[in-house]
């Protein structure tokens, strides 16, 4: 049974909002159907009642199997596979932005109805499978007293954590199960208001840069443009000095980042704006161009002006880059990572995408992990369901967040409703050559192993100690999200 709100006026408003027509156009892929925008007092809002998995399990394709490798976590968000195969899990809930309008008061309880009731962990948990049999015997707290940790990356012997207010680091030795002290702050991150609090992160494999996604402070500038300073952007950060610069802008909420193997291209998944109807605007996957502008707040899906933004900026709209691949409207995509050959030929060339699921559609979407195939280095064709079964007509059993590919042949999925980490593997291993250089500059998840990784030069900090922003490499290198 769907969660009911007992306040009669609220219930009436929600019912009226849900009465509009909601045909589901195919607003996914490289050329989505956008349709006309719709305006109303409230969006359609349906959240299925959270329920225990019980004997149920997520559904995966034939030839694959799924298991729960960690349970009883405290809101797991993103994961990082370390060079020795250990997994770090970032646990936490952030953000406490004030509600601006009556609609925010209405939507708040409905959003909350589809989330876990446990207290935020504000910690990192380490998982270990000592004998490689797929059972993670060790589940222990690696570090606590963090502030809504989300993005994770590793460069050489340091683990980087993107809290909601700062980028911090821990020294690390292979096999270590607990941090040896409090983290060192690399740089503060924008945190005032924190309407979108998550700070996604990935590392270049040569260890020179971290990329951090910083979401907007509103849906569509309700707090004014001053509140959007250093928001809806991706920062490029020097991990040695903390110096940073804006790498790309106009991305409303970049919730996960990854680097494409081979090309070194930075990719992001982005949550788009609300309140233009159930079928606008699609969340998206895109290659991130240095200096690129992706539309927010002035336009969506390239150069389609948002009618609510006044005054408009025609030059900004004209410069907006059309994203590479639409993921559907309101899917709340929160995870992305490139696959590897060990995941099997059908799922070896492309990205896995974690969809947390909608709250503002009468016909729910998302609540699954999909695979987006690539051809010649670009997204191609329709998305393929890879992990489903997180909800049915009556109940929600889980909500996927981060997805991380273990290069040995496994997909790690964080479920922040059931507080479980799922692991999906082929039932029979695929015979593929192992990549050389495992355990190089960055670990898989928020910054992945690359055989060409190079240790950051000791001279980098001195060369940039004059306060200048770090110079961008011609082509950022690395893998993972």
What are these regions (language model features)?
Residues 72, 82, 155, 204-206, ...:
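Structural WD40 beta-propeller signal
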Residues 433-481:
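Compositionally biased, proline/threonine/alanine/serine-rich low-complexity intrinsically disordered stretches
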Residues 79, 152, 201, 254-257, ...:
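Hydrophobic core register within WD40 beta-propeller blades
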Residues 86-88, 158-161, 209-213, 265-269, ...:
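Conserved beta-propeller blade signature
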Residues 138-155, 163-204:
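Asp-box/WD-like beta-propeller blade repeats and closely related beta-sheet repeat scaffolds
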């Amino acid at each position: 049974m769907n969660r009911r709100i007992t306040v009669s006026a609220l219930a009436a408003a929600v019912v009226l909002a849900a009465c509009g027509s909601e045909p589901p156009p195919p607003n996914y892929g490289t050329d989505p159907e956008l349709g006309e925008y719709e305006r109303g007092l409230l969006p359609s809002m349906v959240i299925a009642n959270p329920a225990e998995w019980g004997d149920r399990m997520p559904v995966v394709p034939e030839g694959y199997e799924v298991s729960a490798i960690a349970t009883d976590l405290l809101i797991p968000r993103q994961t990082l596979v370390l060079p020795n195969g250990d997994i770090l899990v970032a646990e936490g809930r952030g953000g406490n932005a004030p509600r601006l309008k009556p609609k925010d008061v209405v939507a708040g309880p409905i959003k909350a109805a589809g989330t876990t009731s446990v207290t935020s962990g504000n910690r990192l948990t380490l998982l270990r499978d000592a004998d490689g049999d797929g059972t993670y015997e060790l589940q222990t707290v690696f570090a606590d007293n963090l502030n809504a940790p989300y993005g994770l990356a590793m460069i050489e012997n340091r683990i980087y954590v993107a809290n909601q207010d700062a980028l911090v680091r821990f020294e690390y030795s292979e096999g270590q199960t607990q941090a040896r002290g409090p983290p060192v702050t690399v740089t503060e991150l924008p945190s005032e208001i924190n309407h979108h609090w998550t700070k996604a992160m990935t590392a270049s494999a040569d260890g020179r840069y971290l990329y951090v996604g910083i979401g907007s402070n509103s849906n569509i500038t309700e707090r004014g443009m001053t509140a959007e300073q250093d928001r809806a952007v991706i920062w490029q950060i020097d991990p040695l000095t903390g110096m940073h610069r804006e790498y790309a802008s106009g991305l409303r909420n970049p919730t996960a980042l990854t680097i494409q193997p081979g090309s070194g291209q930075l990719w992001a998944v982005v949550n788009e704006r609300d309140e233009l109807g159930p079928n606008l605007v699609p969340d998206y996957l895109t290659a991130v161009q240095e200096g690129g502008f992706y539309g927010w707040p002035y336009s969506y899906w390239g150069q389609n002006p948002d009618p609510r933004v006044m005054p408009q900026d025609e030059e900004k709209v004209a410069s907006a880059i059309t994203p590479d691949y639409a993921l559907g409207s309101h899917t709340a995509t929160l995870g992305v990572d490139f696959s590897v050959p060990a995941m099997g030929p059908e799922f070896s060339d492309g990205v896995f995408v974690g969809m947390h699921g909608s709250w503002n559609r009468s016909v729910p979407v998302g609540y699954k992990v999909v695979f987006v195939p690539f051809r010649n280095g670009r997204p191609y064709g329709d998305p393929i369901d890879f992990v489903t079964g997180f909800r049915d007509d009556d109940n929600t059993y889980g909500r996927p967040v981060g997805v991380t590919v273990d290069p040995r042949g496994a997909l790690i999925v964080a479920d922040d409703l059931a507080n479980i980490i799922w692991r999906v593997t082929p039932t029979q291993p695929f015979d593929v050559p192992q990549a050389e250089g495992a355990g190089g500059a960055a670990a898989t998840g928020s910054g992945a192993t690359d055989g060409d990784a190079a240790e950051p030069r000791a001279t980098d900090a001195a060369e940039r100690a004059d306060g200048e922003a770090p110079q961008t490499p011609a082509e950022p290198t690395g893998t993972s999200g």
